[in-house]
């Protein structure tokens, strides 16, 4: 149940709502789909970041595609062995609104953490240019519709594989593997 709408607008890419609710606290909603909230964001961000960073033997260079709320970046810069985190999000408005309405999530961006570089741009195009560079790539994106659709394509996964170092790890928010079997197959086919 929403108690207050703090922001309702439209960026170049999507509809954006920031609202308060009794159950989840402040929430970010993109194109009508819940993305994150103050009260439970840690479960998602800690899982998508810490698991691959603890599994990799030496994760120095991390790339985050998406992640405009800043939560994945906040968690990645906490690892002492990580030297650099590059975050590329297509929607600069989500980044700015997150800094304003979700300062505890976007802490690393707000504090200009020296390990973090934030780029507003197309993550698909960015990935095409990288080769054998990243130890860990995290794709923290919305569902496979709208601006996130291309992040679930076979070509994107091929480019991701090329951008990883030989021992690199890749993690992506992919919805349920039972509901999206083709997506899981495309990932493993790369």
Residue ranges and their predicted role:
Residues 1-27:
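N-terminal auxiliary segments of SAM/dcSAM-dependent transferases
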């Amino acid at each position: 149940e929403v108690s207050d709408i703090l922001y309702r607008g439209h960026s170049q890419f999507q509809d954006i709502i920031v609202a308060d609710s009794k159950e989840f606290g402040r929430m970010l909603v993109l194109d009508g789909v819940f993305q994150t909230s103050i009260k439970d964001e840690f479960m998602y961000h800690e899982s998508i970041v810490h698991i691959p960073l603890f599994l990799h033997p030496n994760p120095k260079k991390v790339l985050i595609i998406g992640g405009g709320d800043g939560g994945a970046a906040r968690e990645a810069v906490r690892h002492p062995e990580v030297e650099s985190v590059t975050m590329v999000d297509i929607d600069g408005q989500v980044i700015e609104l997150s800094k304003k309405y979700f300062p505890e999530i976007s802490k690393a961006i707000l504090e200009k953490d020296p390990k973090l570089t934030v780029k507003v741009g197309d993550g698909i195009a960015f990935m095409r240019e990288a080769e054998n560079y990243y130890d860990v790539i995290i794709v923290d994106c919305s569902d496979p519709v709208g601006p996130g659709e291309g992040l679930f394509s076979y070509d994107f996964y091929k480019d991701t594989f090329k951008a990883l170092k030989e021992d690199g790890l890749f993690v992506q928010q992919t919805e349920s593997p039972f509901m999206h079997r083709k997506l899981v197959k495309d990932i493993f086919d790369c």
